[in-house]
Amino acid sequence: EISCSLVGSEMCKETELVEPKKPIVIYIDPATPKKWVPYLIQGVNDWQKAFEKAGFKNAIIGKEAPTDDPTWSLEDARHSAIVYKPSDIPNASGPHVHDPRSGEILETHINWYHNVMLLLYNWYIVQAGAIDPGARKPQFDDELMGELIRFVSSHEVGHTLGLRHNFGSSATVPVEKLRDKAWVEANGHTPSIMDYARFNYIAQPE
């Protein structure tokens, strides 16, 4: 359901973005280390641009879970959440529950294992260490690790929206473009966050 922001308007213009009456809200587990919460929220909100292309604004929102309401539970199936799990599993996953009659996605509880940061560290130091001095450290700066967390959380949110891996997207980019600094800055190195083309390891130091 959508509502038009123009007072008294019977119909919304095709070019006007409308707000859903019930936006998708994904809460961040209060147990999540505070310094990573803004990056997880941004990973959710990064999908707003995709919904804007479909005509909706503020259709998906990441926010901190309430901590002052004793009746609110992170495990309540009426709420979607990114759940922090203090585990040595180096992974994250984005399952969802859907209504088999309509296909409507009802809720998600994204699994965010603490040790996914070790996985991110290993990926980045191997794939980007040649061109990013920030990768050649025993521990990444919070800003770098935060951006890596943002990227993975956005990927997992994509799964909760029903998207599968898009391994073909990176194949559309010619190798020479991956070494073209201006082109990559303008277009990125892969068209889809759902690909596994995580970092541009084709690029070389200038």
Task: Enumerate the predicted regions with their spans.
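Acidic, His- and aromatic-enriched active-site or binding-groove loops in soluble protein domains
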Residues: D76-S102, L106, V184-A197
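Acidic helix-start/capping segments at beta-turn-to-alpha-helix junctions
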Residues: A59-I82, V173-K177
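Short pre-active-site segment immediately N-terminal to the catalytic Zn-binding motif
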Residues: T32-W36, A135-S153
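Zn2+-dependent metallopeptidase catalytic core
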Residues: P30-A59
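Active-site recognition of the HExxH zinc-binding catalytic motif
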Residues: Q42-Q48, G103, E147, F151-N166
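Active-site scaffold of zinc-dependent metalloenzymes
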Residues: P23-I26, P95-L144
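Conserved catalytic/binding loops enriched for acidic/polar residues
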Residues: S169-E206
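Single conserved hydrophobic/aromatic residue that forms the stacking wall/gate
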Residues: E1-G8, C12
